[in-house]
């Protein structure tokens, strides 16, 4: 069996991606436009079929008379996404941004415009030259008046796949050339875990390859999906998904492996496997794990050899577990009082985890909570007590639910992309810290409200910059950030807000300047297939010509860089196909070292895809080498071992993140002291969109209830409030109020309601503070505080609220129509 560690695999892929880019720059020189004459289309297809890809998979587009009429899944996709019709619809959706637009008051008064009127939809159409000149003037003004810390270019969001038209990298490239900017680090998905895990495991863990699915199928006796719904969430990928996880799950089901799903909602995954469903109160997972750990310890079921050889600090944690250090034993009975499960069920769960080979596959929602750092730290501690980390089919995994983690890695090369020109950072693009300074991404509102204020982050003290201008491309913060009404007040601190997108999201509607970008189906690009499998490299060929006056992200930023006097530095003399071919040729050079054959660029572009063989990747066992010899294969932690107790965190002295996994009361929870509202809001990932992407398409017809975002409510909670299926409901707390449509179902536990995150914010009266959101943006209700001083992640799952039948005047949802004048 291959002894390749997750760190080695991740580091090699990241290193190779960086080398791909640098080698391409050195080897190819200026490719210019010659490649366009060698098979690349400068224009969209008039009639016929063309292959391309998206966050939902590889597809073949059928074009008739210059219009895309169908997106059919690739015939080698084992589990095509049901969302492809919505992807097609996004090109022609009424939400398309057609022309460059400027908020009327900003056009007339500039930075003296009333900022509280943002979002009222009063825009004026301008020419591209007028829009780009205005953007360039604003960037220069802020740079000259405030320096690089006056411009925020963090621009977090899922954008679109493609190694050239990566709008966030391109934006950072332009802003770096313009003199610098304030960036953001981390992400909204895994902020707490990606800070705590390097202290515990020596790696981010959340974006690492998992033990391969074939190994899991062969060896795992019990699969536990803890706060994870991989049957739903693996439809999408950060790059182009291969959907390889579905083959693994199908094989696991066919084998009859026992599956447990721990979740307040009966998930699609639970239904698929016929799984046992365990539903603790939301936000009490750490208490449940502690009760299980106490059972293992008190019944002498823990693996003492693994703890002694592969971990450090268990004795200090055990003192807390038994109550020796604080007087409170974390027994199953203690846990039962907090999480609402019977004590005997907690004990039986613990015993079942050590009865055979067990894989703990955890999702990320349990760390998007107040004190979220504790959840995955405690999960690793529980897995360490079970003692199967590094064994085939055992241990834990934090990305089986994300981008098809566990899909076996191929022998192919890593594909590089365009650089932002700043500090070279290995790994995912959103983890970059290039720029004049950087803040944790979820603290953007704190930054705007507290310029010059100090904050703690991962052992360091930092100061919030005084930002005057924000530029957002490929993201929708008015969907993914918490506490919408607090955010709206903070946004008034900005003198200028620029948005570049292809659809009129709530974020675009609150902009001063709006630039229309193409969809990725109106330009050429190149991308990998399979975040973890690296199964293939795909030519993302242009399907149709750009609609209206939309321009590609590369062309927009190149034109902007030209106005800033940095055009040559931005383009380096390359056009679209020159860059794309350079990325491919760098991958070819890398493949030569691996004895992997690849066709010429011209043949590749003609064929549309090059696939790679899978050999050793099918046998990958995460942490096998570490388990075999921790001394010669140490982790990246200070001790080289799994740090159940972290001396580094101890030195930080944080009162909200102790040195070992600890149960800490969140700011609000069901059953918690002083809980003001009776229902927990489970803000789950949506089934038929990617966060907020595709909410403005025809896919909404699949799930909207009475024209609103659906709200799953238990029959008991519905009956107590006189609520019936299909009713329009008002969900409210002290932070805001939203309308949703009722779906009465026992799939959600009593005391909880489920509302998908990513619904587009649609204020009834944008000028009124705390106004009703007409459609159903769950982040109107969520709490905007950091998870702790350590990670400063978001707490998007820390929400208590109440619900009632809506008794107000009928409303019309307008967020899916274009603003007036647009």
UniProtKB/Swiss-Prot annotation:
**UniProt KW keywords:** Metal-binding, Molybdenum, Oxidoreductase, Periplasm, Signal
Query: Could you tell me what reaction this enzyme catalyses?
Result: dimethyl sulfide + a menaquinone + H2O = dimethyl sulfoxide + a menaquinol; trimethylamine + 2 Fe(III)-[cytochrome c] + H2O = trimethylamine N-oxide + 2 Fe(II)-[cytochrome c] + 3 H(+)
What does the entry's cofactor note say about binding and number? Binds 1 molybdenum-bis(molybdopterin guanine dinucleotide) (Mo-bis-MGD) cofactor per subunit.
User: Pfam families this protein is in?
Assistant: Molybdopterin (PF00384), Molybdopterin_N (PF18364), Molydop_binding (PF01568)
**Signal peptide location:** 1-42
User: PTMs?
Assistant: Predicted to be exported by the Tat system. The position of the signal peptide cleavage has been experimentally proven.
- A single Gene Ontology CC term: outer membrane-bounded periplasmic space
Q: Where in or outside the cell is it found?
A: Periplasm
| The enzyme's E.C. designation | 1.7.2.3, 1.8.5.3
| PROSITE patterns listed in its UniProt record | MOLYBDOPTERIN_PROK_2 (PS00490), MOLYBDOPTERIN_PROK_3 (PS00932), TAT (PS51318)
List the effects observed when the gene is inactivated: Disruption of dmsA results in the inability to use DMSO or TMAO as the terminal electron acceptor in anaerobic respiration and in greatly diminished in vitro DMSOR activity.
Kind of enzyme, top EC level? oxidoreductase
Q: Which InterPro entries match?
A: Asp_de-COase-like_dom_sf, BisC, CT_DMSOR/BSOR/TMAOR, Molybdopterin_N, MoPterin_dinucl-bd_dom, Mopterin_OxRdtase, Mopterin_OxRdtase_prok_CS, Prok_Mopterin_Oxidored
Q: Where does Mo-bis(molybdopterin guanine dinucleotide) bind?
A: 158-160, 189, 232-233, 262-263, 283-285, 364-365, 368, 476, 480, 500-501, 523, 553, 683-686, 689, 691-693, 779, 796-797
The Gene Ontology biological process terms listed for this entry are: anaerobic respiration
- Molecular function terms from GO: electron transfer activity; molybdenum ion binding; molybdopterin cofactor binding; trimethylamine-N-oxide reductase (cytochrome c) activity
Q: Which cofactor does it need?
A: Mo-bis(molybdopterin guanine dinucleotide)
The protein's superkingdom reads: Bacteria
Q: What does this protein do?
A: Catalyzes the reduction of dimethyl sulfoxide (DMSO) and trimethylamine N-oxide (TMAO) to dimethyl sulfide (DMS) and trimethylamine, respectively. The terminal DMSO reductase can also use various sulfoxides and N-oxide compounds as terminal electron acceptor in addition to DMSO and TMAO.
What is the similarity comment for this entry?
A: Belongs to the prokaryotic molybdopterin-containing oxidoreductase family.
Q: How does it assemble?
A: Homodimer.
Q: Which NCBIfam families match?
A: bisC_fam (TIGR00509), PRK15102.1 (NF011682), TAT_signal_seq (TIGR01409)
Name of the protein in question: Dimethyl sulfoxide/trimethylamine N-oxide reductase
The record lists the organism as Cereibacter sphaeroides (Rhodobacter sphaeroides)
């Amino acid at each position: 069996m291959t002894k390749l560690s997750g760190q080695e695999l991740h580091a090699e892929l990241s290193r190779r991606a960086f080398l791909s880019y640098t080698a391409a720059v050195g080897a190819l020189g200026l490719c210019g436009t010659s490649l366009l004459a060698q098979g690349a289309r400068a224009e969209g297809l008039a009639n016929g079929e063309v292959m391309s890809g998206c966050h939902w998979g590889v597809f073949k587009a059928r074009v008739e008379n210059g219009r895309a009429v169908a997106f059919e899944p690739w015939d080698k996709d084992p589990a095509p996404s049901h969302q492809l019709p919505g992807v097609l619809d996004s090109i022609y959706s009424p939400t398309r941004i057609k022309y460059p637009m400027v908020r009327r008051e900003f056009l007339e008064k500039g930075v003296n415009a009333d900022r509280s009127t943002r979002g009222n939809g009063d825009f004026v159409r301008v020419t591209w030259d007028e829009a780009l000149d205005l953007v360039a003037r604003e960037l220069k003004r802020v740079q000259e008046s405030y320096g690089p810390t006056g411009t925020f270019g963090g621009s977090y969001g899922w954008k679109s796949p493609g190694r050239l038209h990566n709008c966030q990298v391109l934006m950072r490239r332009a802003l770096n050339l313009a003199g610098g900017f304030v960036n953001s680090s981390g992400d909204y998905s895994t902020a707490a875990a990606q800070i705590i895990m390097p202290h515990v495991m020596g790696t981010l863990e959340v974006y690492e390859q998992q033990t391969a699915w074939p190994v899991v199928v062969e060896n795992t006796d019990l699969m536990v999906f803890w706060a994870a719904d991989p049957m739903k969430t693996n439809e999408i990928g950060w790059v182009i998904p291969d959907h390889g996880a579905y083959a693994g799950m199908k094989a696991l089901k066919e084998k009859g492996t026992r599956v447990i799903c721990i979740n307040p909602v009966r998930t699609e995954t639970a239904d698929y496997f016929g799984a046992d469903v365990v539903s603790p109160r939301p936000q009490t997972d750490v208490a449940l794990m502690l009760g299980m750990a106490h059972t293992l310890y008190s019944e002498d079921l823990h693996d003492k050899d693994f703890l002694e050889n592969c971990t450090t600090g268990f004795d200090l944690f055990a003192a807390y577990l038994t109550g020796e250090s604080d007087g409170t034993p974390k027994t199953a009975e203690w846990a039962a009082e907090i999480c609402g499960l019977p004590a005997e069920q907690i004990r039986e769960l613990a015993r079942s985890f050590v009865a055979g080979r067990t894989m703990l596959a955890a999702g990320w929602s349990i760390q998007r909570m107040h004190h979220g750092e504790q959840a995955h730290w405690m999960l690793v501690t529980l897995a360490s007590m079970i003692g199967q980390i590094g064994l085939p089919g055992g241990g834990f995994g934090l990305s089986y639910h994300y981008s098809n983690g566990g899909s076996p890695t191929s022998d192919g090369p890593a594909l590089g992309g365009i650089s932002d020109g700043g500090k070279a950072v290995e790994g995912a693009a959103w983890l970059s810290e290039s720029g004049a300074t950087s803040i944790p991404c979820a603290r953007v509102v704190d930054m705007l409200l507290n310029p010059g204020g100090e904050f703690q982050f991962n052992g360091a003290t930092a100061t919030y910059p005084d930002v005057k201008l924000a530029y957002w491309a490929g993201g929708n913060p008015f969907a993914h950030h918490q506490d919408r009404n607090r955010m709206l007040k903070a946004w008034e601190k900005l003198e200028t807000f620029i948005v570049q997108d292809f659809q009129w999201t709530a974020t675009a509607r609150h902009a001063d300047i709006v630039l229309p970008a193409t969809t990725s189906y109106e330009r050429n690009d190149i991308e990998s297939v399979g975040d973890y499998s690296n199964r293939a490299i795909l030519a993302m060929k242009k399907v149709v010509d750009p609609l209206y006056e939309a321009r590609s992200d590369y062309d927009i930023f190149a034109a902007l860089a030209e106005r800033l006097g940095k055009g040559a530095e931005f383009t380096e003399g390359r056009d679209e196909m020159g860059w794309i071919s350079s990325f491919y040729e760098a991958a070819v050079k890398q493949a030569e070292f691996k004895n992997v054959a690849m066709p010429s660029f011209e043949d590749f572009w003609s064929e549309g895809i090059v696939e790679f063989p899978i050999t050793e990747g099918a046998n990958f066992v995460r942490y096998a080498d570490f388990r075999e010899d921790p001394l010669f294969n140490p982790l990246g932690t200070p001790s080289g071992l799994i740090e159940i107790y972290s001396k580094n965190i101890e030195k930080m002295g944080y009162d909200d993140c102790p040195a070992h996994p600890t149960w800490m009361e969140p700011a609000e929870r069901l059953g918690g002291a002083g809980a003001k509202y009776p229902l927990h809001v489970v803000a789950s990932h949506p089934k038929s969109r990617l966060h907020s992407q595709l909410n403005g398409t025809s896919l909404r017809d699949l799930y909207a209830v009475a024209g609103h975002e659906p709200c799953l409510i238990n029959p008991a909670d519905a009956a107590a409030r006189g609520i019936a299926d299909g009713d329009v409901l008002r969900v409210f707390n002290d932070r805001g109020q939203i309308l949703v449509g009722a779906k009465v179902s026992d799939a959600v536990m009593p005391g909880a309601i489920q509302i998908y995150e990513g619904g587009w914010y649609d204020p009834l009266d944008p000028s009124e503070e705390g106004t009703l959101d007409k459609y159903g943006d769950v982040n109107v209700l969520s709490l905007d505080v950091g998870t702790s001083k350590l990670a400063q992640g978001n707490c998007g799952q820390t929400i208590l609220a109440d619900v009632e039948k809506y008794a107000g005047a009928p409303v019309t949802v307008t967020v899916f129509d274009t603003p007036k004048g647009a």
